UniProtKB/Swiss-Prot annotation:
Cofactor(s) for this UniProt protein: Zn(2+)
InterPro entries named among the record's database cross-references: DEAD/DEAH_box_helicase_dom (IPR011545), DNA/RNA_helicase_DEAH_CS (IPR002464), DNA_helicase_ATP-dep_RecQ (IPR004589), Helicase_ATP-bd (IPR014001), Helicase_C-like (IPR001650), P-loop_NTPase (IPR027417), RECQ5 (IPR010716), RecQ_Zn-bd (IPR032284)
Main localisation: nucleus
UniProt-listed CDD domains: DEXHc_RecQ5 (cd18014), SF2_C_RecQ (cd18794)
Species per Swiss-Prot/TrEMBL record: Rattus norvegicus
Subunit architecture: Monomer. Interacts with TOP2A, TOP3A and TOP3B. Interacts with RNA polymerase II subunit POLR2A. Identified in a complex with the RNA polymerase II core bound to DNA. Interacts with RAD51. Interacts with WRN; this interaction stimulates WRN helicase activity on DNA fork duplexes. Interacts with MUS1; this interaction promotes MUS81-dependent mitotic DNA synthesis.
Source taxonomy: Eukaryota, Metazoa, Chordata, Craniata, Vertebrata
The protein's name in its UniProt record: ATP-dependent DNA helicase Q5
Residues of the Helicase C-terminal domain: 241-398
Motif position, DEAH box: 157-160
Region (Interaction with RAD51): 653-726
Alphabetical keyword list: ATP-binding, Cell cycle, Cell division, DNA damage, DNA repair, DNA replication, DNA-binding, Helicase, Hydrolase, Isomerase, Metal-binding, Mitosis, Nucleotide-binding, Nucleus, Phosphoprotein, Zinc
Residues found modified as Phosphothreonine: 527
């Protein structure tokens, strides 16, 4: 069908202007060049090539003539999304337009094809992709239209895709030349926004455009766009810089809170889009990500919100923007360098289509540049392996190098773009950063050259011989330097071998990495239990690598086994089987230390239950629970048996203050020597009694008779408790099993205990007379934690000899008999703090009692002069008697005190209560020395440390200088 339905030029111009007003709603054309191009297409006697910047009105150059023509115009466009935008726009103008693509439903496709089969189709424009144009399914429709002479125009949008010299080459566009040859009688219109002279020649040749071609090309210069380049290496906060740029470009917000425009930020990767959208949103700029990784519905929603300006900034990959008709885009920012100058110009040109001032910024960094360069070369290498080398391969590198030059050289940005596209240098009039402040740009580039991140490496080729004088022996072995003379002749053969070796190594490396990918250990992630989890201590991570899911599975096994057992035994009472299963599982969990042992224990219990079911017996839960608990206690090591590394320092001989002995008890009396001599006299008799009653001096926690002697004391005041501290049954069981063997191992301890049971040394004579003098309130312990070691000596104020003898007995026996003496673990030490006395026993170190008689006598005679003072001062007596059974001994090491201080002080440091780490260390050092020097009576090191820290921060928000703790006094004794 003829595309020239008008008889005269005047009639043609009148119809064009009338359609422009009635259909498209414009009173006049945007530019004279646009009007000339439309008139040439409407005339229809030549093929037309149109090159106009984005937003200059290219689409109208073929849409208006298509509406005036009587036939159908086929429009080839590269993207379905771009096609859909054009179709929606024309449908809003009530233009009959359709798209034939793979996303149509069966019904829509059927309706479209039936319309095209009519004698006079209603469709004026038919949009297709180049793939559809070459497909076999489209050929019958095309042949039908050709045979009926219903084709008015063939329009190729984004015609630069046909050129291998272009920035967006698509091989399917090359097939359009054959389609153009079949439509020889219909004019062809090729349109693009970017075309270098080389690309323009390729378009003419590939599309078989008839000469002479009516060419309409607008200069690429756009005066309303301001171009600038920012260097990431010189910006302390790049996200903040981008935020400021966005807010400045968007301008003041309207009364309803919306911005007067919108903006686009382009990123190279999907991950960068997501990250940048989050960073901008957190800094007060509402932004959303748009990329191919999102679902189609999500992408549509984000695009619609941006079009409606609900979201002012969209962070997208380069797939966004083609065909998006939005005039008030106030800025376009590139977070990474683009792949070509043409691509950058096309993407940045989406700003300011309304002619108002807009901004285009490129964030440039050498790292981004190297990454993009690597990807370009990698893509070229793949293509060359398939099809060989082509001259057009250089075009891709040249296009990228042009953009690198655009960023790294001082010069007008608009002039650099115009030079690339073959246009004359425009009158910039301070339309870019270089023309506005060239000195500042030079200063930035100089700073980049001297920055460490800029480095020495470059993209350009190396020297011809490959010898670098700054590298050792000129660089790579065999390629330069003196080593070159030691090997055979070089040349192209050596280079070929090097390349082959490099490829072989790369393949080997990739294979090895692929093998290791599946073997990488994944970090353990503990899944917390749900709200309805029936397990006890479900959130406990006592057993490593044991998940809650595995424990629940084991619980189900136990519950099912118990259920079958009840059915097999014919039990009728409604016992809660789940509760029993939970108890069994928890006991197994407590007794096991490893996942395999836990699972084995569960399976063993299941087997026992099944065995009971097979015998027709009801499974005995109580005996199983007791045995499991006993096993748990036997297998579970005490917190005090294996001291942490920091407490091993306590095993070393410690330096103590003047006047203190080196033994476990600092106070020794002269009466201890008397006690020793009496013990030696009674040794034969004690040995005989020890044979008859070998365990009478050991407290038996299982024995119900509480009047049995403990620690060698034969009697006790009525109502008093024999076992010190009254530990729990579990601890008593554990203590008796561990302590009896240790106690029997020492014959000397048996002798001393037997001697203590003699009437001449009975403690009852001291206890009978102390009711006359009540003890001080501070020294009275609670009824539950009553201890002979803490009560008896503190209340007795008899003669000096008796008191001294009592102290001697305690000094001899308390440090040695851990299980039978005061419960240090329960009274003085919090859980997890090992006893220094027990540490001395655990390690086979020389004991003070094993020293020579002369040294022991000398040490005991030193404090003996103060025995009268001890007898006359009740508080002193109380302290002397209690201190061997508590941690708060003046001989605590500085290392132990420092460990405790750091442990309790660290949370305050993490909360920012110290302005510096040095100040934190200084205060910890000061506090450790205070604790090591003296302690309050009856308080442990941990209690004293907590008290001092609480006192220090009571009226102080932060510790700001060393002067803050100068007034902090240590504990007073």
């Amino acid at each position: 069908m003829s595309a020239r339905p008008f008889s005269t030029p005047f009639d043609r111009e009148r119809r064009v202007r009338s359609t422009l007003k009635k259909v498209f709603g414009f009173d006049s054309f945007k530019t004279p060049l646009q009007e000339s191009a439309i008139m040439a297409v409407v005339k229809g006697d030549k093929d037309v090539f149109v090159c106009m910047p984005t937003g200059a009105g290219k689409s109208l150059c073929y849409q208006l003539p298509a509406v005036l023509a009587k036939g159908i115009t086929i429009v080839v466009s590269p993207l379905i999304a771009l096609i859909q935008d054009q179709v929606d726009h024309l449908l809003a103008l009530k233009v009959q337009v359709s798209s034939l693509n793979s996303k149509l439903s069966v019904q829509e496709r059927k309706e479209l094809l039936s319309d095209l089969e009519r004698d006079k189709p209603r469709t004026k424009l038919l949009y297709i992709t180049p793939e559809m144009a070459a497909s076999a399914s489209f050929q019958p429709t095309l042949n039908s239209l050709l045979s009926r002479n219903l084709l008015s125009y063939l329009v190729v949008d984004e015609a630069h895709c046909v050129s291998q010299w272009g920035h967006d080459f698509r091989p399917d566009y090359l097939r359009l030349g054959a389609l153009r040859s079949r439509l020889a009688h219909a004019p062809c219109v090729a349109l693009t926004a970017t075309a270098t002279p080389q690309v323009q020649e390729d378009v003419f040749a590939a599309l078989h455009l008839k000469q002479p071609v009516a060419s309409f090309k607008t200069p690429c210069f756009r005066a309303n766009l301001f171009y600038d380049v920012q260097f990431k290496e010189l910006i302390p906060d790049v996200y903040g810089n981008l935020r400021d740029f966005c807010l400045k470009a968007l301008g003041q917000k309207a009364d309803n809170g919306s911005s007067s425009g919108c903006g686009i930020v382009y990123c190279r990767t999907r991950e960068a889009c997501e990250q940048l959208a989050i960073e901008l949103s957190s800094r007060g700029v509402n932004a959303k990500a748009y990329h191919a990784g999102l679902k189609a519905s999500e992408r549509t929603q984000v695009q619609n919100e941006w079009m409606e300006e609900k979201v002012p900034v969209i962070v997208a990959t380069i797939s966004f923007g083609m065909g998006v008709d939005k005039a008030n885009v106030r800025f376009v920012a590139h977070w990474n360098i683009a792949k070509s100058m043409a691509g950058y110009y096309q993407e940045s040109g989406r700003a300011g289509r309304d002619g108002k001032p807009s901004w285009c910024r490129l964030y440039y960094s050498r790292n981004d540049r190297d990454q993009v360069s690597f990807l370009i070369r990698k893509e070229l290498a793949k293509l060359q392996e398939k099809r060989g080398n082509k001259p057009s391969d250089k075009a891709t590198l040249l296009a990228f190098d042009a953009l690198v030059t655009f960023c790294e050289e001082v010069g007008c940005r608009h002039a650099a773009i115009a030079k690339y596209f073959g246009d004359a240098p425009p009158a910039c009039a301070k339309g870019c950063d270089c023309c506005q402040s060239p000195a500042a740009i030079r200063k930035k580039l100089d700073a980049l050259e001297h920055s460490s991140s800029w480095g020495k490496t470059c993209i350009g080729p190396s020297q011809g011989d490959g010898f670098d004088p700054e590298l050792y022996e000129g660089g790579r072995r065999g390629y330069g330097g003196f080593s070159r003379y030691d090997e055979g002749s070089g040349g192209s053969g050596d280079e070929g071998r090097d390349e082959a070796h490099k490829r072989e190594w790369n393949l080997f490396y990739q294979r090895q990495m692929s093998l290791r990918k599946g073997k990488e250990a994944k970090p353990e992630e503990f899944t917390p239990p749900g709200e309805d989890c029936p397990l006890r201590d479900a959130s406990s991570r006592k057993i490593p690598k044991l998940t809650v899911k595995a424990r629940e599975h084991c619980l189900r096994l136990l519950e099912e086994a118990l259920n079958s057992n009840h059915q097999a035994a014919g039990s009728t009472h409604g016992a809660d089987l789940q509760a029993k299963a939970v108890e069994l599982e928890h006991e197994t969990f407590r007794s096991a230390k490893m996942v395999n042992l836990y699972k084995a224990s569960v399976l063993k219990k299941v087997a026992e239950i099944h065995k009971a079911s097979k015998d027709g017996q009801l499974y005995d839960m109580e005996s199983s629970t007791k045995s499991c608990g006993a096993i748990a206690e036997l297998l579970e090591p005490s917190d005090y048996d294996i001291p942490p590394t920091s407490h091993l320092y306590s095993l070393k001989p410690k330096r103590v203050g003047a006047g203190f002995s080196k033994g476990p008890c600092p106070f020794q009396t002269a009466t201890e020597l008397l006690g020793k001599s009496q013990t030696e006299k009674l040794a034969p008799e004690a040995a005989l009694e020890s044979e008859q009653e070998p365990s009478g001096w050991v407290c038996d926690p299982q024995d119900g008779d509480r009047s049995k002697p403990c620690l060698g004391y034969q009697e006790e005041a009525p109502g008093s408790r024999t076992n010190c501290g009254d530990p729990s049954p579990e601890k008593r069981t554990k203590g008796s099993s561990q302590g009896s063997a240790k106690a029997r191992a020492s014959k000397r301890q048996q002798l001393l205990a037997t001697a203590a049971r003699k009437d001449s040394q009975s403690i009852t004579r001291f206890l009978r007379q102390r009711t006359e003098c009540p003890p001080p309130a501070a020294s009275v312990p609670s009824s539950e934690d009553a201890s002979p070691c803490g009560d008896v000596p503190g209340k007795c104020t008899e003669e000096v000899g008796a008191q001294g003898h009592l102290v001697a007995v305690f000094q001899t026996e308390c440090p040695r008999e851990r299980l039978s003496t005061c419960s240090l673990e329960d009274q003085s030490l919090p859980k997890g703090q090992p006893s220094p006395l027990k540490e001395t026993q655990a390690e086979k170190r020389p004991r003070p009692q094993q020293e020579s008689q002369e040294k022991r006598a000398q040490k005991r005679l030193r404090p003996s002069t103060n025995s009268s003072a001890l007898a006359s001062d009740p508080s002193t007596e109380n302290r002397v008697a209690r201190e061997p059974c508590q941690l708060s001994a003046p001989g605590i090491s500085l290392k132990e005190a420092a460990d405790i201080v750091v442990r309790y002080l660290t949370p305050f440091y993490k909360e920012g209560r110290f302005i510096s780490k040095d100040l934190f260390k200084g205060f910890a050092r000061h506090l450790s020395h205070l604790l090591a020097q003296k302690l309050s009576p009856g308080r442990s090191v941990k209690e004293e440390a907590q008290s001092l820290i609480k006192q220090f921060f009571h009226n102080r928000a932060r510790c700001e200088s060393e002067a803050d703790w100068h007034g902090l006094c240590g504990p007073q004794r």
